[in-house]
């Protein structure tokens, strides 16, 4: 399987997995044009689309792609049923695509119906987990997002985190504002800064590394607890997550 990223809009990535025969899976096609261009350039045959949630920058290209390739099966959560989804999937179910079994993981927070798809090593996590950050809480609660991230953080170490936006640099600036002396965060920030200066993608990232540099996955880390305790005493990791998310919203 080959993993490909297609830039869209200002900072979106549309992910495409293809096999040696050229069959492909498209994830969150917010815009059809760059996908159609990539399909033509690579002679791919689209078999399926995965949708993680209902926001337009993730579903906007579905209609045109299905018109062009009517055999495509469109998988998505209930909230995408009016966005072109033909096969509604929910937590604990599986989608069989390109000969691989993808587990569906419910991850409410960014939206109430947000889902992720996992087939080792690929995690298509939409706007739930970003490198160095997590999605804004447009519909769900901090508690829901905390639990969703916990689900993802226990996936295998070598999981490739394929999120939908190039937010890594701004996320790492925030991480440095919280833990300015953390060696892992500083090293990763420098690496990301160099990549973005060359207009290069920072994704996918390896989950094992993400656990070290993403403050939203470190709510039980003593260094982070000490920082938060300087401002307020919060006993539960869930409360610390909410504190971080609120800080990031104002950053």
Curated annotation (Swiss-Prot):
Could you tell me the Gene Ontology terms of the biological process aspect for this record? methylglyoxal catabolic process to D-lactate via S-lactoyl-glutathione
Residues annotated as binding Zn(2+) 1 are 53, 55, 110, 127
Q: Which reaction does it catalyse?
A: an S-(2-hydroxyacyl)glutathione + H2O = a 2-hydroxy carboxylate + glutathione + H(+)
Sorted alphabetically, which SUPFAM superfamilies does this protein's record hold?
Answer: Metallo-hydrolase/oxidoreductase
Subunit record text: Monomer.
Tell me the protein family, please: Belongs to the metallo-beta-lactamase superfamily. Glyoxalase II family.
As for what it does, the entry says:
Thiolesterase that catalyzes the hydrolysis of S-D-lactoyl-glutathione to form glutathione and D-lactic acid.
Which NCBIfam families does this chain map to? Answer: GSH_gloB, PRK10241.1
Name the chain's protein.
Answer: Hydroxyacylglutathione hydrolase
Gene name of the record: gloB
């Amino acid at each position: 399987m080959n993993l490909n990223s297609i830039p869209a809009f200002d900072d979106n990535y549309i992910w495409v997995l293809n096999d040696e025969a050229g069959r492909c899976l498209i994830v969150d096609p917010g815009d059809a044009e760059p996908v159609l261009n990539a399909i033509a350039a690579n002679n791919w045959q689209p078999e399926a689309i995965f949708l993680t949630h209902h926001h337009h920058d993730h579903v906007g290209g579905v209609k045109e792609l299905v018109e062009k390739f009517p055999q495509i099966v469109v998988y998505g959560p209930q909230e995408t049923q009016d966005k072109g989804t033909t096969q509604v999937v929910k937590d604990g179910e599986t989608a069989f695509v390109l000969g691989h079994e993808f587990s569906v993981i419910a991850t409410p927070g960014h939206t109430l119906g947000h889902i992720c798809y996992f087939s080792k090593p690929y995690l298509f996590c939409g706007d739930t987990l970003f490198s160095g950050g997590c999605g804004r809480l447009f519909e769900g609660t901090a508690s829901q997002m905390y639990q969703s991230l916990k689900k993802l953080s226990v996936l295998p170490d070598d999981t490739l985190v394929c999120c939908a936006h190039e937010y890594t640099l701004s996320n790492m600036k925030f991480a440095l504002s919280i833990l300015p002396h953390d060696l892992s965060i500083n090293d990763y920030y420098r690496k990301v800064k160099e990549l973005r200066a060359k207009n290069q993608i920072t994704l996918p990232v390896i989950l094992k590394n993400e656990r070290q540099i993403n403050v939203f996955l470190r709510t039980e880390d003593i260094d982070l607890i000490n920082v938060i305790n300087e401002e307020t005493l919060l006993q539960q990791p869930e409360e610390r997550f909410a504190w971080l998310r609120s800080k990031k919203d104002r950053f």
